Amino acid sequence: MAKGKRFLVLTTDAFGGHGGIALYNRDLLLALCNFPGCSEVVAVPRSIPGPLEDERPNNLTYVTTGLHGKVKYVMAVLKVLRENPDFEFIVCGHINLLPIAHLVGVWLRKPILLFVYGIDVWQPSKRKLINKLIKNIAHFVSISEITKERFTKWAKLSDKKGSIIPNAIHMENYGAGDKNSRLISQYGLDGKTVLMTLGRLSADERYKGFDEIIELLPELIREISGIVYMIIGSGGDRERLQKKAMLLGVGGHVVFTGFVSESEKPDYYRLADAYVMPSYGEGFGFVFLEALACGIPVVASNIDGGREAVRHGKLGALVDPHDAEDIKKGILKALKQPRMIPEDLEYFSYSNFEQRVHRLVTEFAKD
């Protein structure tokens, strides 16, 4: 009997993590576990921010001893290699993990498959070693065309050395529906027109467009008096955004919810009349898929990965994030759209994601 294939995945986070990259990594691990002939996937996460409540595949070994520092992470990887070094290839789940992935690749004499996401690879790394090691990867996977283009340009990689596998949306976890009456009461949204953006409130992620929507509110209020901007997420930039809203006289029209769990997200998305994120540094924009899967019209940027999430305007409105008037037009257009889940969202289904991963793995796991 032929032995099963084993894959080693070095990743930032997946199960127990939050955000688009963690969700992507979960789907990637599931797809690898479902690859025909796969006997085991060994994943070593760098962090596990939340509880490990998600159900995991039986053939996934999720190593939890590499948390809390680089030394512990390296030791966890070494322990995996000592126990059984027989892997088909190494998946490097983030460019910052490339140094350790490179060492493992040299030791095992196996190829490295690097996954890249967004602004983290749009320009050279501040760590010169990482920039040097990029030429040694066998292949890379980007979640979007724009990230692939920017990465190959500065890294001087052949276009053929990269593939695109966008995020997946698990439609069964979402669905269209009425606004949740409890949440309407909790946030005082009865009779309000709700715009929404979800994301980490960090100085490093101001490119998501929170400021642009707040600055546009005075003008929007003149046209729609009951309009409210709901910002979902937590982070150190919240206080600055709150002060900005107050200074502009729209403090009463901006609602900050704080952190919202994955299980609560669908009910929150359904509160929106339009999901708006005029970003200028988003690698893809998984939140657009989530909003669309809840039947919410969306407004995305025409200059970053958001345009790919809405399939270049097929699934939602595209606007110039640096043009306030264009953003306003996009919002007003979205507010006139019916609440419905577009059929073309199936393009991003998990089954299609898994097929894309399996086609890629076939090239790296040949007998």
What do these predicted ranges mean?
Residues 280:
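Aromatic "clamp/platform" in nucleotide-sugar-dependent glycosyltransferases that forms part
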Residues 92-98:
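Short His-centered aromatic/hydrophobic patch
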Residues 146, 168:
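Carbohydrate-associated surface elements
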Residues 259-260, 267-272:
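Short alpha-helical donor nucleotide-sugar binding micro-motif in glycosyltransferases
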Residues 10, 189-208, 214-217:
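Conserved donor-binding/catalytic core segment of Leloir-type glycosyltransferases
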Residues 239-260:
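Nucleotide-activated donor-binding/catalytic signature segment of Leloir-type glycosyltransferases, i.e.
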Residues 297-300:
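Short hydrophobic beta-strand element within catalytic cores of glycosyltransferases
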Residues 312-313, 317-324, 333-336:
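Conserved acidic donor-binding segment of nucleotide-sugar-dependent glycosyltransferases
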